[in-house]
Structure formats: structure tokens, C-alpha cells
Amino acid sequence: MCLLMLVLGAMYVQGWHSAGFGKRTLKKRCYPGQPGCGHCSRPNYCEGARCESGFHDCGSDHWCDASGDRCCCA
């Protein structure tokens, strides 16, 4: 059971949960200080990129929403 949780945890960290197990998408995960979460096309527009946790710096013109799921334009 513990090993299963470890494997699932590793898959979650790699972002497979957002792609449906194995199907990799072009969506980038955002980490604190990491640039390139996409470019802002309009104010307050949220992209589908994943954030490591809420309200981290997702690049110069992005922030993470409270759910930690999206990068939004400032």
C-alpha cells in the first residue's frame, strides 16, 4: 500500500494527473520564480498551467490562483 502511494505521488508530481495518466500535454507546471508560464493576452486571463501551490510567482506577469491550478495574468 505504501509503495502504491509512493508511485501515485511521483506521478502526481510529474503532472500526469492533469493529462490523464501517460498522455503528456504541453501545459507547463509553474514553480516559484520560474518564467515562461505563457504570455498574457489580456488582463486577468487564467491559463491552464499548473502551479505548485497558490499565489507563487509564476513569472513576471503571472500569479497563481488560490486553487493552485492556474497561472493568471496580473
From Swiss-Prot:
Disulfide pairings: 30-37, 40-71, 46-64, 51-72, 58-73
Record GO terms (molecular function): toxin activity
Q: Name one GO cellular component term.
A: extracellular region
Known tissue expression? Detected in mucus secreted from ectoderm.
Q: Which residues does UniProt assign to the signal peptide?
A: 1-18
Question: Where does it live in the cell?
Answer: Secreted
Q: Which UniProt keywords apply?
A: Antibiotic, Antimicrobial, Cleavage on pair of basic residues, Disulfide bond, Secreted, Signal, Toxin
Q: Name one GO biological process term.
A: defense response to bacterium
Report residue numbers covered by any propeptide: 19-27
User: Where would you say this protein principally sits, based on its record?
Assistant: secreted
Function (record text): Potentiates activation of mammalian TRPA1, a non-selective cation channel involved in perception of pain, in vitro yet has an analgesic and anti-inflammatory effect in vivo. Has antibacterial activity against C.glutamicum (MIC=50 uM) and, to a lesser extent, against S.aureus but not against P.aeruginosa or E.coli.
Q: Which family does it belong to?
A: Belongs to the Cnidaria small cysteine-rich protein (SCRiP) family.
Something else known: Negative results: has no effect on mammalian TRPV1 and TRPV3.
Q: Mind telling me what this protein is named?
A: Tau-AnmTx Ueq 12-1
